[in-house]
Every structure is written in structure tokens, then in C-alpha cells.
């Protein structure tokens, strides 16, 4: 995943993502095209900010608001929360949110630059059953956005694969075990070997 977000480079072979070739020029533009929700992002975010300001940090690809922003940018962050069905989080302190509410803030944050891809790495970890189901519904809403990004959803739980997820890649110890259309991969036969 860190390779996909251009945090690491391949140690062998070549990688090309969204037209950017690693090792052949500047790839800083790639980072703007990929949003990510992961524990390594969560750990860097300040807890004292409101939900919409946490979302706004995604516009600057930073864990803090070090650049000046105006009412327009802050309204964009609020609108992003509303578009994901989480308008009730506006004005609330991030540190006081439930784990599921924090995750939806991070998903909204990942969408602030209108990315082509968002990576959701174990997005439901730490959630109870009801919070998990609510978050999965909100993730499905992303596909309804005007410029819906490709959603790369990483999980260890097949039951988290939603209706709108259509392609599956199964890995075991970093190696591809199976890949293809969801209906071809999520079968008792394939999952029994996994």
C-alpha cells in the first residue's frame, strides 16, 4: 500500500500508477490523485480539531492546517461530510467522536482533493457490528459521488465486501492467490482454500 501511495519505491522491477512511472521523473502529482485511510495517517492527526477541520487537512495532504484557508475551503470540508451522510459531525471535536465517526471523517478527508483512487486500509477495525455496517454503507455512497474514485478496500473479512465492489484480489503473504470478478472469486471453493 505504501508503494501505491508513492511513499516507497519498488526494490526491483518497475511500477506505473495512473501514468506515473517510478524512477522516471517527478511523481509528486501522483500523491494528489490518491487518497488513503489507514492507521499510519490516523496516528499523525491532531485530536483537538473539529471534524470538518480534520477533513480539511486532506486538501493540503498534511496532518495539520499549516496553510491559510478560508470559508470556501472549510465549507468544502463540511459539504464532503454531508455528501457521505455525516453532516451531524460538523462542529464536533475529533477526539470526542466514536471510532466509526472518526473513520468517516478520514474517508471524507481522503476525498478532499477529488482523487482518482482511494485506499481504505482495514477501515472497520475497532468498530462494533452496527458501526461497521453503517460505515460500509457510507463507503458504498462514495461510488455515487459525481467523480467517483476507484475504491481499493483492504480487509481480512469477506463479509465486508459490499455490493458495489466488483473486482477482488486475494493475497496470502504478499502473493496473489486469486483475482477477478467478485462473483468468480467470492465462492465457497475459492474461500475454502484461503
Can you say where each PLM-predicted feature lies in the sequence?
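Helix-to-loop junction immediately C-terminal to a conserved catalytic motif
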Residues: 5
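Conserved ABC transporter NBD signature motif
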Residues: 13-24, 30
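Conserved ABC ATPase "signature" region
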Residues: 56, 71-89
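Conserved ABC ATPase signature
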Residues: 93-97
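Catalytic Walker B motif of ABC-type/P-loop ATPase nucleotide-binding domains
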Residues: 118-122
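H-loop/switch region of ABC-family ATPase nucleotide-binding domains
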Residues: 155-156
Amino acid at each position: 500500500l505504501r508503494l501505491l501511495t508513492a511513499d516507497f519505491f519498488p526494490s526491483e522491477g518497475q511500477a506505473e500508477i495512473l501514468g506515473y512511472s517510478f524512477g522516471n521523473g517527478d511523481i509528486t502529482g501522483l500523491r494528489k490523485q490518491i487518497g488513503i485511510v489507514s492507521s499510519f495517517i490516523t496516528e499523525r492527526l491532531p485530536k483537538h480539531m473539529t471534524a470538518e477541520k480534520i477533513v480539511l487537512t486532506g486538501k493540503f495532504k498534511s496532518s495539520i492546517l499549516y496553510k491559510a484557508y478560508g470559508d470556501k475551503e472549510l465549507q468544502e470540508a463540511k459539504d464532503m461530510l454531508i455528501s457521505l451522510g455525516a453532516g451531524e459531525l460538523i462542529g464536533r471535536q475529533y477526539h470526542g467522536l466514536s471510532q466509526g465517526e472518526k473513520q468517516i471523517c478520514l474517508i471524507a478527508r481522503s476525498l478532499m482533493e477529488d482523487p482518482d483512487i482511494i485506499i481504505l486500509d482495514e477501515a472497520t477495525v475497532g468498530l462494533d457490528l452496527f458501526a461497521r455496517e453503517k460505515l460500509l454503507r457510507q463507503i458504498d455512497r462514495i461510488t455515487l459521488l459525481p467523480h467517483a474514485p476507484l475504491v481499493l478496500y483492504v480487509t481480512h473479512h469477506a463479509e465486508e465486501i459490499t455490493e458495489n465492489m466488483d473486482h477482488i484480489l486475494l493475497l496470502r503473504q504478499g502473493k496473489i492467490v486469486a483475482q477477478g470478478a467478485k462473483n468468480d472469486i467470492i465462492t465457497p471453493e475459492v474461500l475454502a482454500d484461503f
